[in-house]
Amino acid sequence: MIIKKSGGRWQLSLLASVVISAFFLNTAYAWQQEYIVDTQPGLSTERYTWDSDHQPDYNDILSQRIQSSQRALGLEVNLAEETPVDVTSSMSMGWNFPLYEQVTTGPVAALHYDGTTTSMYNEFGDSTTTLTDPLWHASVSTLGWRVDSRLGDLRPWAQISYNQQFGENIWKAQSGLSRMTATNQNGNWLDVTVGADMLLNQNIAAYAALTQAENTTNNSDYLYTMGVSARF
């Protein structure tokens, strides 16, 4: 830029304005933005930075998020969601330690409970201020042992679990629905589950599992689960 000589305070003022403007322009261009991803508890926070010349690669970010969802070594704790979509809430914890090369194992424990609000109408007289029947909210605890392995992108796993229903052995339904008697229900049971997870690509993962349980009364001894998932 060429500045003509004009003399006086106007020239000095113009020169100062150009210098200050150039300072702010360079500062704005070099300012970096930061994208923070919170990984599983116990893992360090991953950070992704970029500027106008280095835009973020969201495919890499998504791939790392899927990878972080796999079981890591050490203590793992999963707390219940504060605002779950489903009224049934769960919390779990486990300890995963290496066994041999790509094989890890460890104990697992979980608690599943009904988070239905007591303000709903039922034939037992429950309300927001009075809970006449504490068994309206059922819960089931699980204690088991799990083995995980890895064969490339395929992650086979197996788990054996002991499940115990807390409280009296009666599931109570809403008014107008039939209830099963205690003799037709199971207070505790064992189940064995085998499954596998696999990354189809850097954006999508597939999973499948087969569970066999004992003491079932509806002749459904097996439970099949299969699907795909993507984490954003």
Curated annotation (Swiss-Prot):
**Phenotypic consequence of gene deletion:** Increased biofilm formation.
Q: The Autotransporter domain covers which part of the protein?
A: 1-232
Supply one GO CC term from the record. outer membrane
Query: Under which name does UniProt file this protein?
Result: Uncharacterized protein YhjY
Q: What gene name is given for the protein in this entry?
A: yhjY
